[in-house]
Amino acid sequence: MPDIIPYDRRAAVRYAHRWAFSRNPLFYDFEEIGGDCTNFASQCLYAGTGIMNFTPTYGWYYINPENRAPAWTGVEFFYDFLTRKERTPGPIGVLANMSMLLPGDFVQLRLTKEIFSHTPIIVDIDGPPTLDNILIAAHSYDSDYRPLSTYDFQEIRFLHIIGAYKPENRPIFQ
């Protein structure tokens, strides 16, 4: 069974502040082809865990724009990967209520479509957790320290990050 390593929330939030209004050149900007929000969320999450899962289709990884997992850039796939039951390498999270949230956790919003379509990262909670006090950073549209209450959404869900499953070190010969 893989070990769980802690999530470095401060590293994830620092990354969010650093790149909220610009783009890290190591990653493609998906703004013009569906939006960059979950790509940015994944970058922040990776900054806090340092672990990717290179399983084709069902993993969570980015090598280049043509070689990435659907969970790296897709809102629903991101949710499905984080809340998976399998103990495979990579970040893990749970569906949470507002009282469980901490900086470094994620919000997913269903704006006007039938599906969730936006994934900001929580960068600060200014007092008791309310929509006014939860401050986020995001791409598509770029923002930092934006109150969650400023979004017009149909539905909201929260993802609390627990840590990450560490890849198992297996001997080559058994």
Question: What are these regions, as identified by a protein language model?
Answer:
Residues 62-136:
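...with weaker cross-activation on analogous glycine-rich loops/strands in unrelated enzymes
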Residues 50, 77, 90-100, 141, ...:
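Mature, Sec-exported extracytoplasmic domains of Gram-positive
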Residues 21, 45-46, 112, 125, ...:
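Residue-level marker of positions within ordered structural domains that often coincide
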Residues 54-57, 119, 148:
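Short, solvent-exposed loop/turn and secondary-structure capping segments
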Residues 1-73:
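N-terminal capping segments
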Residues 121-174:
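Glycine-rich, aromatic-bearing surface loops/beta-hairpins
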